[in-house]
Amino acid sequence: MNNFTYTLEHSDGEARAGQFSTPHGTIQTPVFMPVGTQATVKTLDPLEVEAIGSQIILSNTYHLYLRPSADLVAEMGGLHRFMQWPKPILTDSGGFQVFSLGPHSKIDEDGVTFKSHIDGSKHRFTPESAIGIQEKLGADIIMAFDECAPQPTTHAYTKAAMERTHRWLLRCIAAKTRADQALFGIVQGGVEADLRRESASFIAQQDVPGIGIGGLSVGEPKEQMYGMLEETTPLLPRNKPRYLMGVGSPEDLLEGVARGVDMFDCVLPTRLGRNGALFIPEGRLNIGNAKYAREDAPIDATCDCSTCQRFSRAYLRHLFRTEEVLGLRLATLHNLRFLIRLMEQAREAILQDRYQSFMDDWLSRFQTIPHAVREASRAARLNSLRTQGDKA
């Protein structure tokens, strides 16, 4: 615990500006964390990831356990040395992937038996093994093994999954041996307000230096997700960081910050970038659109990323049409910087007691994606991951 301290610098309503210290550096919050599923942020060199202002990145326990293995990563000196990333790293527990990518997963009180989405081989995770794997990987922040109940489901099943998550957290705490890693507990409870409150109260009582909020942004409407945050965050300790897991659209980041969330991660900006969809203040720009073929303007004239400072929309469209790898890299770099900068601006607004007006002004210009469109895309991605392997 001595290696990890959270300082709440200032609050503006429920929005918080803080600092979380780790052995590999101090993280200023609110913060967006790029996802490096396979110990790499897809298409980018770690130096580029650092240059766009990334303070911390996330890697995935499930995928690294399968390839190249936690033992190999440990043999290579741990994740930081393996991937040459000098700043903090967070690893998830693998629970979400076990339940979402493994349709044949079998859950019991001790753990989960599942089949690899790569070759169908059988594996088993328990709270103890999930902690052991993450200790070998060596991230600064590790997550408790939890059960993310599928949605929609019954109140009874959601309650059972939540209670199992609580019991598993106690086992994770008992199994943890490394003092240089911070173990976060995870609030569950689906979209049931009473369960969210119960879970938040339970996790808040545990001796963990930070708290994740899981099981959201898995198919429910945004308004429901925001409502669950409003049930959850008021019950969490003010002296610990709150991490909303797997959430990364610009509007969700701002709405999450307004409800007291400090940390976010998502593959959305990198995935969208590789598919030619770029964030701009008005929403998303599809670079494949023919109208950009002769447009000499940058993707976003207000953006300070090297893509926008150097290249035109016409050039990026050309790169995507000719399937040049540089196009994927430039789009990924822009999207990540867009979200990182958004959180920098949010932090500044909080410190100046103007967060609500900042958010209202920003969201008044940004066009969001309809729920039905998002859900169709999410379902297609999950099906692809289950049948073809991860391309996140």
Curated annotation (Swiss-Prot):
Which pathway does the protein contribute to? Answer: tRNA modification; tRNA-queuosine biosynthesis
Q: What class of enzyme is it?
A: transferase
Q: Which domain of life is it from?
A: Bacteria
The segments labelled RNA binding in the record are 246-252, 270-274
The UniProt record gives the binding positions of Zn(2+) as C303, C305, C308, H334
Its job: Catalyzes the base-exchange of a guanine (G) residue with the queuine precursor 7-aminomethyl-7-deazaguanine (PreQ1) at position 34 (anticodon wobble position) in tRNAs with GU(N) anticodons (tRNA-Asp, -Asn, -His and -Tyr). Catalysis occurs through a double-displacement mechanism. The nucleophile active site attacks the C1' of nucleotide 34 to detach the guanine base from the RNA, forming a covalent enzyme-RNA intermediate. The proton acceptor active site deprotonates the incoming PreQ1, allowing a nucleophilic attack on the C1' of the ribose to form the product.
Record's protein name: Queuine tRNA-ribosyltransferase
Please name the gene that encodes this protein: tgt
